Amino acid sequence: SKGKAITFLEKNNYYYKVSAFRKNFKKKNGKYQHLDFQHLVDLATIDMYLRDTLLDIAINVEHFIKVELSRLITNNPDEDGYTIVQEFAVNYPTYYNSTYNRFRQSRYQKDMFLKRGSEIPIWALMEHMDYGCLLKLVELYFDKYRPSSLQKAVTLGDNSRHLRNACAHNNVLMVNVFRDD
């Protein structure tokens, strides 16, 4: 009913988000076919649960990439945790500077930064890397040592990052799902 639709839009969602799902329905003579507002509500609800699930998965993937990279660096006799930071700064200066500045300006971990001065180990720096920056570090390490355990992170990392960002920013995922082309 119209009343239920208004209540839903006032309390649960907003028109722009819900109306995006109409793209999943065919148009005939400029009018959507077999479209009922409840269908939009159902798709919005499913989309929300899908986003929440995928966000949890993507966050876990990011975490396990950090864990694996940290493990590899720690157990690598050719790495001291500082040299790779210098290499990262040279190879990816924009990413390094962004992370360094985020670390330096962090009001929550300022003590950690001040304690280290200019000698920042990779384990401390990784705590302040965004996902894209982390993937550049993975790429650097992978190109140097070729550990098979990072192969999927190198190959699929950007896909996971894009999906994580779409979910975290509450983007509509289930749009144009039923296209024939």
What label would you give each PLM region?
Residues 170:
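Acidic/aromatic/glycine-rich contiguous surface patches that form carbohydrate-binding/processing clefts
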Residues 1-162, 174-181:
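Extended intrinsically disordered or low-complexity regions, especially N/C-terminal cytosolic tails and loops
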